[in-house]
């Protein structure tokens, strides 16, 4: 089926893990409310099941669920979704910088752009 072959991310990852896995190791981070308004949490459960089964390489990322949280939950367990939605930059820029520092080439400039 066309949709599955081209848009079902879990299916595509499972089908192509030998090729995609090494490129995505440590890069997959999924946050989902367990009461998603569109029931997307059900798809996330299936994705997590696949990711946890990966080997060579293991996906080495994270899947996190917000208890009673709705759509757009972003991983903040300390605040209600209506407030945490206002904090995307606060939360994810730090994670992006940590990833850049960890994976940057040895001669990369990691200081001049930080202020």
Predicted feature locations:
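Short, well-structured alpha-helical interface segments that form or flank functional binding sites
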Residues: 4, 8, 25, 42, ...
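Extracellular/periplasmic catalytic domains that process cell-envelope and extracellular macromolecules
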Residues: 21-24, 57
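Mobile cap/lid helix-loop segments that gate and shape the active-site cleft of serine hydrolases
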Residues: 1-21
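C-terminal catalytic histidine-bearing segment of alpha/beta-hydrolase fold enzymes
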Residues: 29-115
